[in-house]
């Protein structure tokens, strides 16, 4: 998967903002990215502090761009644009104060074209990363919500790695039918970015009517709407998980679609199922989990775990930049 994304970035090099410019994990990942020449880190913070932190840690970040909100040349222009974007919800003084914060400043760098994408959250909360994105980058045309997916990769020593997409595992707590449709559409698009030919399964405790109830109806109805929304993508359900992934079970349950037994893109009914599901896959199925990958925004903005390591930062940077249209 990463070879696929790196080749894409080599053909079209990108710039990615890191909001925590002095963090050792960010600096280590930046040094590694710079050695590949396909992705330029844009580090937010004081240049002297960032340079000193890199030197003390032994990381070569020559070639990285450093942007400091304290002496940014186009700050007045940035403030004016943010006032316009907030449409009376924030005064000029409030915008200027917000832009002294790395997350707002970094998000505006993406908005103004100084960078293509942003990765934050190594020391900030998810809300600190997502809130500026919603206020400044906003949802793209046709999207009403921001959702998330995880890309799950199981390494193989003998052939191609197994790659799956799972959603929504982190953002929408109890999505409606229409929100599930949007989540499915966006997740199928994300899957394609990572080289997955999506076969989308709507998951439930029921397989094609074997169970009854409002929750089953919601997944079945959402599935039918998703089929209409993306007629060129195989979509089916509602399925129990085993019917979605096991050809034997799918045959036993008389599922004839190309999705049954062969699904690789999974839509969960709610965040409980999604979060539990991807973590079972990660911990007991020996899959590597990459995400949450935010979907539905006008530009790629992603959130790191505060417990991340430098390799995870490096990987998520490639993933985030790979999402740039």
Identify the function of each model-found stretch.
Residues 1-260, 265-325:
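Anion-binding alpha/beta catalytic cores of soluble intermediary-metabolism enzymes, centered on
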């Amino acid at each position: 998967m990463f070879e696929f994304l790196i080749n894409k970035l080599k053909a079209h090099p990108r710039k990615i903002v890191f909001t925590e410019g002095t963090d050792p994990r960010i600096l280590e990942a930046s040094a590694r990215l710079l050695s590949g020449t396909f992705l330029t880190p844009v580090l937010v913070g004081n240049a002297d502090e960032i340079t000193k932190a890199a030197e003390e840690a032994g990381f070569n970040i020559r070639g990285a761009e450093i942007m400091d909100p304290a002496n940014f040349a186009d700050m007045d222009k940035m403030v004016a644009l943010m006032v316009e974007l907030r449409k009376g919800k924030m005064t000029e003084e409030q915008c200027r104060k917000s832009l002294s914060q790395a997350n707002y400043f970094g998000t505006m760098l993406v908005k103004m074209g100084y960078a293509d994408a942003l990765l934050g959250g190594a020391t900030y909360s998810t809300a600190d990363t997502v809130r500026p994105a919603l206020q400044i980058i906003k949802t793209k045309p046709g999207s009403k919500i921001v959702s998330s997916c995880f890309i799950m990769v199981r390494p193989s020593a003998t052939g191609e790695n197994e790659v799956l997409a799972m959603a929504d595992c982190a953002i929408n707590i109890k999505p409606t039918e229409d929100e599930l449709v949007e989540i499915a559409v966006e997740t199928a698009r994300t899957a394609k970015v990572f080289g997955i030919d999506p076969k989308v399964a709507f998951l439930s405790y029921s397989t094609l009517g074997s169970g009854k109830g409002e929750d089953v109806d919601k997944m079945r109805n959402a599935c039918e709407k998703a089929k209409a929304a993306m007629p060129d993508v195989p979509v089916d359900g509602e399925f129990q998980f085993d019917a979605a992934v096991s050809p034997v079970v799918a045959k036993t349950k008389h599922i004839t679609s190309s999705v049954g037994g062969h699904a690789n893109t999974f839509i969960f009914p709610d965040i409980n199922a999604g979060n539990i599901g991807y973590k079972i896959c990660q911990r007991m199925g020996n899959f590597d989990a990459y995400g949450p990958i935010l979907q539905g925004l006008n530009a790629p903005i992603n959130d790191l775990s505060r417990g991340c390591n430098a390799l995870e930062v490096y990987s998520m940077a490639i993933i985030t930049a790979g999402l740039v249209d």
